């Protein structure tokens, strides 16, 4: 019997995908497989808008809180664990719903992992030093000049930029040019985004609520676990808003200033997410209502109980 098509629900940060996913999961008896680069970390709760204990008690979730903030975690680990979770869910007669906005993770599942050469520690160290000396924009510009599509895949993530240049300088090709290992499953992507004005309001309100709920204190805790000044910059400190939240906790930035800075960064990231959905996932970005209707129709066809 052929493996079923696995549904994926994605949207920009703050668009409301978690609320929609929870509603559909309760209605159709789904289990949620998270696709978020930072909710995998234990302790990053408020700043990642991780589902609450009550929400997780009402719907089974996978790939949340799987690694400590002091540990490294990469896309290959994510893909292996997410695919194992999907196998387990299907074996129990349930249907998974992949939910998240981290394009790199979604691409790894739906397209497979790039067949790139192994890492070269010496080259990696040299590039990390170059990153500190020249800055992220200079290294990104080097990728952009050689392969604009590869540059778009980087999402301004320093680790991805370093890895891309490591592979390029060693082999003359970027990771995305090596082809991909076959994905374990086939996926149907349902992508949505509210109108721009609504998104702006949602981002602003969400940011303010997260800061009031204790995000600065969470960032202060994180700094005690993983100093943000470490070089290379720790992965957990690449999460949106944590640097600003820490600045609030340390009295270096006002709450209002942090709110504006984080909201701006979130809107900019949301635009990059939409670009990734269209270019890398091949998704049609619909209105929330249209995406929900299409996903419901998919679930009805799949035989998910309602």
Curated annotation (Swiss-Prot):
Enzyme class, first EC level, given as a word: transferase
Residues the entry annotates as binding substrate: 13-18
Positions bound to ATP: 11-18
Site, as annotated: Interaction with substrate tRNA: 102, 124
Keywords: ATP-binding, Magnesium, Nucleotide-binding, Transferase, tRNA processing
Family matches, as InterPro entries: Dimethylallyltransferase, IPT, P-loop_NTPase
Catalysed reactions, as listed in the record: adenosine(37) in tRNA + dimethylallyl diphosphate = N(6)-dimethylallyladenosine(37) in tRNA + diphosphate
Gene3D superfamilies linked to this entry: 1.10.20.140, P-loop containing nucleotide triphosphate hydrolases
Keyword Disulfide bond recorded: no
Keyword tRNA processing: yes
Cofactor names: Mg(2+)
The EC number(s) this enzyme carries: 2.5.1.75
GO process annotations (BP): tRNA modification
Molecular-function GO term, any one: tRNA dimethylallyltransferase activity
Functional description taken from the UniProt entry: Catalyzes the transfer of a dimethylallyl group onto the adenine at position 37 in tRNAs that read codons beginning with uridine, leading to the formation of N6-(dimethylallyl)adenosine (i(6)A).
Family recorded in the similarity comment: Belongs to the IPP transferase family.
Subunit structure: Monomer.
The protein's name in its UniProt record: tRNA dimethylallyltransferase
Organism field: Deinococcus radiodurans (strain ATCC 13939 / DSM 20539 / JCM 16871 / CCUG 27074 / LMG 4051 / NBRC 15346 / NCIMB 9279 / VKM B-1422 / R1)
Lineage: Bacteria, Thermotogati, Deinococcota, Deinococci, Deinococcales
